[in-house]
Amino acid sequence: MSSKKSPRTLHNGLPRANTHSWRPPTGSASDPDIVLASLPLGTPDYLRVIGAYFAKYNSQHSKKNKGVSFKTMHDRQRMVVSFFRELRHETPYRNLDPRQLANRHIEAMVARWLERRLSTATIHNYLSFLRTFAGWIGKSGMVREPEFYVGADSPHAHRSEVATEDRSWSAMNVDIAAKIAEIARFDSWVGLQLELEAGFGLRGKEARHLKPHGAVVTCDAANPRDAAAFPECRTFLHISAGSKGGRPRDVPIQTQAQQELLDRVMKLVPPGSYVGRPGFTSLQNQAHFYYVIRKFGISKADLGVVSHGLRHQYANDHFEADAGGPSPVRGGTSRPEGNKPARTRVSRVLGHNRERASTGYLGSDAGLPEAANDPAA
């Protein structure tokens, strides 16, 4: 009788990238160290080599003593497997053992990425994943900065975090209320998640993981820096689960529409539950969310927008209301009088500590003149 494979291990020896807690028992046949010791350098079974390293390290942050999200685990594994598969099938390095990774192999693949016209952000992310993997195989510091591989004068040498175009839904003439209502008629849970993204500038994961009961806090209980940035607000929406880097924040409840949305959400979501389809796991809700929005054209290929564009919408609308003028990506040609405090507030409401983080949504105001005083004032 054949032995059953662990449900956490795929048929090709790769671990499932959807669990933090499980690792084969030390000394067992599936212990990563035992697997690696049994595979000599140059083995054709390169996927088992990769799988052993991912089973051992993938749940760990590359630099900090903490775990990483399921998404990071999945993206890392998918990229590294794809990297070695393409390297072995499409370049002269057909017998490369992942433990023998060197810069000449990375250079060969970067050349292919450039030929395929991958974006700067994608190239930087791929190199970051390889840098992490190199650390796992005992080659910390081997993977260089992008400039080393693409050249100092390449537009891919440095990743710009400054928005150069408005990524809001309105910029692509998408009627936000009508589109969300259309989606909500098909799936009310996905509709609610999109409403929360639009109404509070939440990331998709934050909206799906929100447990609304108990999430509304007074200014006295809110993060002091968030409360100080919005002294006019008496209540805030506490966001923690699903936030980037696990950093909690408190989003000001500034309008009647926001309060009415929260009241409606709390009537629909049972206490202790999150804003997702009941009976679905977190990963199932995530997959279902993207399935539904793509079905209704929310993609770059169809309507030219993604769900994250609602966060850009919120940021730019918030800035314009606070500053009294449009952001650079919306055609602003000068710095409104309230430019700096408005940028600070946008950064805080989006969960960033640095004011310059707002440039990723609003664009840069470097070089823009101060707005002229209104002579009629």
Feature-to-residue mapping (PLM):
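Basic/aromatic DNA-contact patch characteristic of tyrosine site-specific recombinases
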Residues: 1-81, 85
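N-terminal core-binding DNA-recognition domain of tyrosine recombinases/integrases
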Residues: 56-162
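DNA breakage-rejoining catalytic core of tyrosine-based enzymes
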Residues: 156-179, 245-256
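Basic, Lys/Arg- and aromatic-enriched nucleic-acid-binding interface segment
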Residues: 174-204, 340
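The alpha-helix within a helix-turn-helix
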Residues: 197, 208, 347
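Conserved tyrosine-mediated DNA breakage-rejoining catalytic core shared by Y-recombinases
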Residues: 209-261
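Active-site/catalytic core of tyrosine-dependent DNA strand-transfer enzymes
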Residues: 252-321
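Short, basic (Lys/Arg/His-rich) helix/loop patches that form interaction surfaces
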Residues: 290-348, 352, 367, 372-376
